[in-house]
Design a protein with these regions (language model features):
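Structural microenvironment flanking redox-active thiols in thiol-disulfide oxidoreductases
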Residues: 61-99, 109-115
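Short active-site neighborhood of thiol/selenol oxidoreductases, capturing the structured segment around
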Residues: 40-61, 67
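A short beta-strand-turn-helix
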Residues: 27-47
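C-terminal motif of bacterial Sec signal peptides marking the signal peptidase cleavage site
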Residues: 13-17
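Bacterial N-terminal signal peptides that target proteins for export
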Residues: 1-8
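Thiol/disulfide oxidoreductase modules built on the thioredoxin-like
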Residues: 95-101, 109-155
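Hydrophobic beta-strand anchors of alpha/beta hydrolase catalytic cores
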Residues: 49-50, 80, 125
Length: 157
């Protein structure tokens, strides 16, 4: 019985090691070039939502599925972006894989986006009108109603 448990433990450790290697070989999130990002927002005719999150943030994990759903419904009319803040690449990649967030994400370890757009802590969500004008900011976890009302406001509904 002890040999069976030892063999099972070795197999489990090997599986974990293989899984870790697979995750570390995935492409890293691109570092955020904040000036280029702001220029993209300012030159866009579409409104945008920027969600700042971290894989270690429990409220961020709570609201992540809302962004997947919102992107499915509004993604053709509103640009969605995610910014991983004060995180590490493996944690950020695992978070994205777990929640299947199907839009562009950037890595911002130092929190330059929070400084530039205003605010501290995560989660934090910025809503920009066409041309990059900041329309609203929500600090803390979003509810479905709050997210939907902000998205509808961006669209002028």
């Amino acid at each position: 019985m002890n040999k069976f448990i030892a063999a099972l433990l070795i197999a489990l450790l090997a599986l974990v090691a293989c899984t870790s290697d697979a995750a570390s070989s995935e492409a890293e999130l691109p570092e955020m070039d904040l000036d280029a990002f702001v220029a993209r927002l300012e030159s866009s005719a579409k409104p945008a939502v920027v969600n700042v999150w971290a894989s270690w943030c429990l409220p961020c994990r709570d609201e992540a599925p809302l962004f997947t759903s919102a992107h499915a419904e509004y993604g053709d009319r509103i640009d969605f972006y995610g910014v991983a803040y004060n995180d590490n690449q493996p944690g950020a990649r695992q978070f994205l894989a777990e929640f299947d967030l199907p839009f562009t994400h950037y890595f911002d370890f130092d929190g330059d986006a929070l400084v530039r757009f205003g605010g501290i802590g995560v989660p934090r969500t910025y809503f920009f009108g066409p041309g990059g004008e900041l329309a609203n900011t929500v600090n803390g976890v979003l509810t479905e109603d709050t997210l939907t009302s902000n998205l509808e406001e961006l669209l002028g509904s």
